[in-house]
Amino acid sequence: SEYKGDFYFIDSGSTDGSSEFIKNSGHHYISLEKNLGVGYSIITAIKFAIENEYEIICGISGNNKMDPNEINNVVNPIIKEDIDFVQGSRFINYESNSNTPKFRVVSIPILSKIISFLFKTKVTDVTCGFRAYKLELVKRAKFEIDKKWLYGYSFEPYFYTNVFLDQHVLKKEVPVKMSYPSD
């Protein structure tokens, strides 16, 4: 990797053996006793990063479709261009993502166009779980992130809606590869 950084995994009560794999990998991890939702896991990571004075957080959905080797592609705009928020997109370089299920090929661009229109911003893949942002963005936010109703899937739309609404936040999309299992 081009940059020095720490990798922390959030184990939210997984039962698929991944927690044992992480424990034996030598990587840092935060183990939650039970799964309280994806939002809770992200909030836990953000709070941990702020408490430990990290500057950037990069999240990758734990669905095994994104390549961690692309972390530099997602983080580079923050470090080199002073961007605040970077969103991965499987549609910027679609040729490398040609195995994306047809339903997603049709529905995600439609949803992304609606979001782009509503928030007067350009985004091509609002559902991609590969993102990075400056923690300063969270620290200076005019919205609360530690609310119980955000512990499930509500956190990501809530957080990103606030990011998209803030015209002072410098945003950028970068291409990422998504790998779906072949049927």
Annotate the PLM regions.
Residues S1-S14:
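Short beta-strand/loop segment that forms part of the nucleotide-sugar
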Residues G5-Y8, S19-N52:
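Conserved donor nucleotide-binding strand/loop of the catalytic core
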Residues A45, N63, K134, V163, ...:
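Residue-level signature of catalytic and energy-coupling elements of molecular machines
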Residues K34-F48, I56-G59, P68-Y153, P181-D183:
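Acceptor/aglycone-binding surface of glycosyltransferases and processive sugar-polymer synthases
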Residues W149, Y160-K177:
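Catalytic donor-sugar/metal-binding loop of nucleotide-sugar-dependent glycosyltransferases
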Residues G13, G37, K65:
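A short, conserved beta-strand element in the Rossmann-like catalytic core
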Residues D6-F7, I56, L170:
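Residues at the starts of beta-strands that form the adenosine-phosphate
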Residues S12, C58-G62:
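Active-site acidic Asp-centered loop
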